[in-house]
């Protein structure tokens, strides 16, 4: 029997990527595709130990579990041992279900059977791999469309008003953002610095707003208080007092918005 190692690695990489993908969906964890694919390729390369006799020692159950655990680490990049063990259990469960499905198909894939007549000369493995690829591709498209709809529904046009002029900016309502300036207790609107580069705000009251990110990083944002801020919500216009904090980074990779509204702004 001739075994093409490159084809075997490719097939197993796709299957492992799919299993990790549905594991992430089950755990409701967002993962970056590059880490997902990298973990799938790592799992695909592990098949080498099954076909090379000198590496047979690494094909035992304990090494298979270690390889699966490393796939979890590469894919999810979580430090929590409890989460990684939970993810490993889900991955093993889906692997067993997939193996059982393949065994069932192979058992019923006999000459003259209805299943054999249905797929003809096409290998059932390639049909399953095609289904896995289509599922991941379509699911990502649906997720992207829904995410875009949600993002657009939370974008509002705001007008930052000064004594002599004003600036219109698209702002995203960050429902998890409760940032307030500690002295005035006013809500903070984070704005890209470039968006107010042409505005003379030197005469406005200056502040430094402390912040802390989820990764533990802390610091202070340079901020000022405009005359007022208008928030356009459908046909209504809300006038608010707020602090404008400036940030150097881009807030949207697609440039959908250039500011973040705190929950207390609306």
Curated annotation (Swiss-Prot):
Enzyme Commission code: 3.4.23.-
GO CC term (a single one): plasma membrane
Top-rank taxon, per record: Bacteria
UniProt KW Repeat keyword: no
GO terms for MF: aspartic-type endopeptidase activity
Major localisation: membrane
Pfam families in alphabetical order: Peptidase_U4
Positions annotated as active site in the UniProt record: 174
Entry membrane topology: Multi-pass membrane protein
Family of the protein in this entry: Belongs to the peptidase U4 family.
Protein name: Probable sporulation sigma-E factor-processing peptidase
Organism: Clostridium acetobutylicum (strain ATCC 824 / DSM 792 / JCM 1419 / IAM 19013 / LMG 5710 / NBRC 13948 / NRRL B-527 / VKM B-1787 / 2291 / W)
Higher taxonomy: Bacteria, Bacillati, Bacillota, Clostridia, Eubacteriales
Gene: spoIIGA
